């Protein structure tokens, strides 16, 4: 129990004086006004005051309010005690935190007291305090606490605010008895509680918008350390744990520094949000960064704030792991009962945890890397012993240069990379305990580095770690079913370490200004040569780093069925070996950026680009496919499929005479057969809409055949947007007879193909009705999602050089807001521009849409027409 009263010197006396029990009666309105003034004062003094004083100041102020109202409601005349519990009990009260109180009573509460308690609590709500309260006798307190560890934890931090001291004195000693909670049971319960919380708050969503309290490495992890030790040692503060040798002084100061930073973030967040909020939503991040003194110019302040945040939660996570394990090994378990086996003269295995046999072992830095090589070599090792963690943390701080400077460390590091299990537990522990930063100073530069956007879910070091883990997963046969092509490639590669090192370095140039891929390529080459890789392998790693974005950009923004696109891509890639490495690196990179954004559509695009390029290599890049031969082949295969379905061949050939040749180049034989069968069986006076039940490239294909009208594309886009579907690809072809063939590939709001047959049938009819309207209906004003409102993406219009002489390629980059594609299509419509294809890509909050267009006369746009279109897009969209 926290027995001492909270006090703080910085609270202006006039606030406390007005709340003195002897002062005048205060109404609800009086207290609300006083609270408002106090909060204004808190905000004004935030930047120059110690956060501990600010938290105590609010607890002191709330104490004064409660004492005043306690007397105004005459509760001081009864045998009842007002006790602060939880964070309020510790004297740590943020601006909008819940005020948790216990009203401790005698066994029986009579009607008069019940009414006074009710009016007291009601007034607390009226003055806008977020009150969490319980009314219990001592017996009821103990009964609930024994059942629920959260109640027990709250009582451990209780502090009397007002009322009868006798009741408090009766309860306090009972909380120290083993019948309440033994150290061991309490420890196990808190560990389970933490494990469940970590599971709940993992993932991209809680990395982009972290919960300062509940996230792994957050405030709750610091509190868990304190609670466990408090239960065992009866300590009231982290500082007391140093006296018990549970914490070392440097660990205490590290925890204190981490706690102070997280507290300051949470304190500022409460003011910015105007409510009790622990999740650092995008809406608040810029304002919190400004309030904390990071500045307010662009994205940099948020990125600086978050970089420090991610470094701090990594430190807290490490300390939490080490200290809880230390508690279990030194206090809960009996060391003499441990199962110990000798590994070598320097290391041993203690209950499956690697431990040093000599406390001075890490005086030789090479031993740190050797330990991780042993972890890779010994499959029975499950982790690092807390004693060894302590030694390693201290040795890490003593390093005056990177471990990379030692030749033996370089040899062992490459042995870890090359070992079949090296990128399993060994890499995970090297990342978790900052050994990668100790080894490679360049890695330290990216540790915790965030980009203020919705696309990159992880800090650069965490993303790079995930990419390496993805690449390693491809080498393991038990994961073959997840990514069969990647697994097949990686398991045949003679030197997978080339691929792994590309994963290490692909983003290491970020944050330095300039092209991060080129900067990283230089770093990678230097690293590889210093680690005795051959010149060929070193150049391969450097090439992969420099071109690591090439395949994703080509697959998502270009027509990968266009032989010119494949030829250009193939010329850069050079050969099948480079293609194999690049494909696997690209899949691992895209999956490791934000798992919620990876989908079958992207997977299929990459795979199709891979096979198209592989085919081009095997036929020879210098030998382009003969167009007439390709058309003839597609027609023959489509006709064979149609004949199987007994479709009249003459009707099909008559239809084909209406099509231009690009139709037979841009669709597969299967698509041609399905589309043409439906067209010849359909009444041409009405639009034909087909929504394929079979996923196409991981999406759903929406096919339209209708009389050509200027607004067909714009009308379809606006319709699909209202159905909350995202468009990823579009092809538009006109026939010689005044009809248009439009194909869209769409995904639902979960990034999945449409599954509901009823829904697709209903939607087909609704789209037919929409296409039969003379004019496009006015769209309702789209609402921007909550998390998008703080982002600004300046509109950029770029014209891209392509081979086709009668086409123009335009790239439009803008904020990915609802209705953007509809707006763009409307501008094209009004500018009398024909759309032939569209590749729609989103990178978090940024839309990057590429269109192939032409004039009404089927020509490429002139320079003057390009300038006019760019201006019009800027005026309408920006």
Curated annotation (Swiss-Prot):
Residues 460-582 form the HD domain. Keywords: Hydrolase, Magnesium, Multifunctional enzyme, Nucleotidyltransferase, Repeat, Transferase. It comes from the Bacteria. Its EC number is 2.7.7.59, 3.1.4.-. GO terms for molecular function: [protein-PII] uridylyltransferase activity; phosphoric diester hydrolase activity. One of its GO terms (biological process) is regulation of nitrogen utilization. It holds the Pfam family NTP_transf_2. SMART domains: HDc. Uridylyltransferase (UTase) activity is inhibited by glutamine, while glutamine activates uridylyl-removing (UR) activity. Its cofactor is Mg(2+). It catalyses: [protein-PII]-L-tyrosine + UTP = [protein-PII]-uridylyl-L-tyrosine + diphosphate; [protein-PII]-uridylyl-L-tyrosine + H2O = [protein-PII]-L-tyrosine + UMP + H(+). Residues 343-700 are annotated as: Uridylyl-removing. Residues 1-342 are annotated as: Uridylyltransferase. Residues 701-779, 809-878 form the ACT domain. Modifies, by uridylylation and deuridylylation, the PII regulatory proteins (GlnB and homologs), in response to the nitrogen status of the cell that GlnD senses through the glutamine level. Under low glutamine levels, catalyzes the conversion of the PII proteins and UTP to PII-UMP and PPi, while under higher glutamine levels, GlnD hydrolyzes PII-UMP to PII and UMP (deuridylylation). Thus, controls uridylylation state and activity of the PII proteins, and plays an important role in the regulation of nitrogen assimilation and metabolism. PANTHER family: BIFUNCTIONAL URIDYLYLTRANSFERASE/URIDYLYL-REMOVING ENZYME, BIFUNCTIONAL URIDYLYLTRANSFERASE_URIDYLYL-REMOVING ENZYME. Belongs to the GlnD family. NCBIfam families: UTase_glnD. HAMAP family: PII_uridylyl_transf. Has four distinct domains: an N-terminal nucleotidyltransferase (NT) domain responsible for UTase activity, a central HD domain that encodes UR activity, and two C-terminal ACT domains that seem to have a role in glutamine sensing. This is Bifunctional uridylyltransferase/uridylyl-removing enzyme. It comes from Colwellia psychrerythraea (strain 34H / ATCC BAA-681) (Vibrio psychroerythus).
